[in-house]
Amino acid sequence: MSVNDGVDQMGAEPDIMEFVEQMGGYFESRSLTRLAGRLLGWLLVCDPERQSSEELATALAASSGGISTNARMLIQFGFIERLAVAGDRRTYFRLRPNAFAAGERERIRAMAELQDLADVGLRALGDAPPQRSRRLREMRDLLAYMENVVSDALGRYSQRTGEDD
């Protein structure tokens, strides 16, 4: 029996569900929700690649509210997208094309926002002694460095693969 035979959790291959559970454990170990990891794991391997909220709830033995909440989180992180199908009132989700590159681009945006917040903090400190502003400067400088490094790496990856977001 293969994943193509349906989205029923009991019908999925044990190795597939083991992978899905490992993704959940990985996310949980990173202080995210286990269900978000399982949802991402399932969308990495399911067929068809587009899954309704109901199909996801069945496949993952999860509540529709849990699917909705965790799908919103994964959308915010840039990994998945919501789809509308003409004539169908259900909500569908799928992995975004180049999902992990998109996720890294979202992380770059978050780094830029945190740099801006560090600048707000530095302005608020005004003429405070340098030892008081040191932590904010370190935060801003590291984030600026990481933003450049990750941006450059994504650019090289896109050139190498010939793919864009």
Swiss-Prot record:
**What turns on this gene?**
Negatively autoregulated.
Q: Which UniProt keywords apply?
A: DNA-binding, Repressor, Transcription, Transcription regulation
Q: What happens when the gene is disrupted?
A: Mutations or insertions/deletions that inactivate MmpR5, or decrease its activity, lead to increased levels of MmpL5 and MmpS5, and to non-target based resistance to azoles, clofazimine and bedaquiline.
InterPro entries reported in the protein's UniProt record: HTH-GbsR_regulator, WH-like_DNA-bd_sf, WH_DNA-bd_sf
Annotated region of DNA binding:
53-76
Entry keyword Cell cycle:
no
Summarize the impact of residue 88 to A.
Decreases DNA binding
The keyword Repressor belongs to this UniProt entry's keyword annotation? yes
Sequence ranges assigned to domain HTH marR-type in this UniProt record: 1-151
An annotated Gene Ontology molecular function:
DNA binding
Role, per record: Controls the expression level of the Mmps2-MmpL2, MmpS4-MmpL4, and MmpS5-MmpL5 transport systems. Also controls its own expression. Acts by binding directly to the promoter regions.
Assembly and partners?
Answer: Homodimer.
Q: What is this protein called?
A: HTH-type transcriptional regulator MmpR5
Please name the taxonomic classification of the source.
Answer: Bacteria, Bacillati, Actinomycetota, Actinomycetes, Mycobacteriales
